[in-house]
Swiss-Prot record:
Changing N8A: Has an excitatory activity before killing the mice. Has an abolished activity. GO terms for cellular component: extracellular region. It comes from the Eukaryota. This is Conotoxin qc16a. Expressed by the venom duct. Causes reversible depression symptom in mice when injected intracranially. The record marks D1, H7, N8 as: Essential for activity. Disulfide bonds join C2-C11, C5-C10.
Length: 11
């Protein structure tokens, strides 16, 4: 899983 960090970006 990845955390949302930005407009439509995953971190």
């Amino acid at each position: 899983d990845c955390q949302p960090c930005g407009h439509n970006v995953c971190c």
